[in-house]
Amino acid sequence: MTTSVIIPAYRAQDCLMRALASLRAQTITDWQAVIVSDDGFDYRALVEAAGMLEGRLVFVSTGRIGSGCHHARNVGLGAISGDALSWLDADDEWLPQRLETLLPLARQHGAAADLLQCVDEQTGQPLPPSQGLETGLQHLDLAAFMQLDQPLVPLFLREHVQERIEGAEMAEDVLANIRLIDRIGTLPLVPQQLYRYFIRASSLAHSEQAEDRFDQAYADYMARLDHGDGFGLGPASRRAALAGFARKRALNQAYAEARRAKPALTFQDFVSGH
């Protein structure tokens, strides 16, 4: 079973090779990577110059500059050939056992996810986990998923692929996972940290304006869940998602207040109690 991996690339010249090297190090070698340029840059030439060009790599472009990771991922869907799909940001990496660990569960349940290890890009040091690490396999329903304070990057079967919602950039991964869980019922979550999530102070999600942008996004999503189309969710899922976004919005507002007193405070430190 081939797993396709979509990698949006925006100003990724200094980090894409690390992401690709982590795929080449997988203990399961049956994968395809779709690199989606979202900045007009020729990443194929970059990879070729680095001596890493191979048949498992496909290069496409959004034809735009900074259209957003949600749009880039949707463009990448048109190039996948695998029976399963997962995501990898160009500035992140997978540990070698990720496919080996998640693929059997995805075959059985439709999808599976692992925990993220958050890493400071500047120092290379792991950051405190935002949640306590469980010791066994969990099956998250939507209410349990909405209690998490860190992203999840699932691997799922092609039959469960859905396009990302256009125009939803902030917390767009949360929306995608809500729709996935609504579709499959529960999401298996292994206790291993197999996805290394590098945090840059300059990234959109960690900029000084992020709290305001997240607050507005959460308000918009809640309104859509309460009296809009509900993103196509069933009634129970709409209620769980609405309650979850209300919690996330309150947490984001508390973090913004804490940052006013302590500007250097990171979200990871805030939610982990450090």
Per-region residue spans from a language model:
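Short, acidic, metal-binding catalytic loop of nucleotide-sugar glycosyltransferases
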Residues: A21-D30
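Short aromatic/hydrophobic "clamp" motif used to bind/position activated sugar donors
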Residues: L85
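A conserved acidic beta->alpha catalytic loop
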Residues: T29, I35-V47, D89
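Catalytic core of nucleotide-sugar-dependent glycosyltransferases
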Residues: Q193, Y197-R200, H206-A236, R259-P263, ...
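Conserved nucleotide-sugar donor-binding catalytic segment
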Residues: G136-Q216
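N-proximal low-complexity "stem/linker" segments adjacent to membrane-targeting elements
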Residues: M1-S22
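Conserved donor NDP-sugar-binding/catalytic core segment of glycosyltransferases
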Residues: L99-L127
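Glycine-rich, basic loop-to-helix element that forms the pyrophosphate-binding segment
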Residues: G63-I80
